[in-house]
Amino acid sequence: PQRRERNFYSSTVGPNKDRTVVIISDAFLFEAAKELQQRLDKRDVFGTEMQYAVTGLPSVTYFGMPSLLPNHELAYQGNKELLVDGQKAINLEQRMHILQTIEPQSQAMRLTDFLSLSSTEQKKYVVDQKVIYFYHNTVDATGDKPASEVNVFRAVEDAIAELERGVDRLRIISIRNIYVTADHGFIYRRHLLDSTDKINLPSDVDFEQKNLRYAIGSTDFDEIGVDNVKLGDILGNDDQRFVFYPSNANVFSVP
């Protein structure tokens, strides 16, 4: 596909000559983005356009967040760590360093921290900056925990309201180019999983990572209901490991 997540910066952010703001909302669904767009379109001051991008696999935060940064080379080190041009991209400071390596006039901040600033402080923060990344985590912080996942739809509604407010504030301080995107979405099922919903992975295959929706390993195998793709094809390198994933609505059986 032409619109790959890992090409986001080079195809969307980099070519802009004007100041550009990117808001990355963790696990913000495509459908939720449509709702946000509809709300913004009701205002005469906003002109919106929605496009898609194809996420890599596994479609999880530790792959998606680094992929949205400027990159020439992405490399999976194992242990849930994806390097960007040989650098870690786990926390805010590391991501800002990567941004500033490509564009020195770059900043990164949590959206909630930005919204807590006064209007004067917000203007001061963005002045002289070319690229600004804001990180937003309302949906994933709720939906990725068993104790709170039942509240994920309320979290989506809260996220839409927070993003709407964020766009409002940015427009007030004369930011014109604003991109709202996500590292991945989510799949939600109301009923409890039983044995018929689960796929047993081969016991004689070693996996570096094994999750409900994906597994990473070096040995290919044939199993009904399981597809795979080479990690190198996802990252654009020569990594020969495989990402395995259910080809239907089922999940992998994990401890």
What are the residue ranges of the model-derived segments?
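Feature captures the catalytic ectodomains and active-site-proximal regions of enzymes
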Residues: 1-255
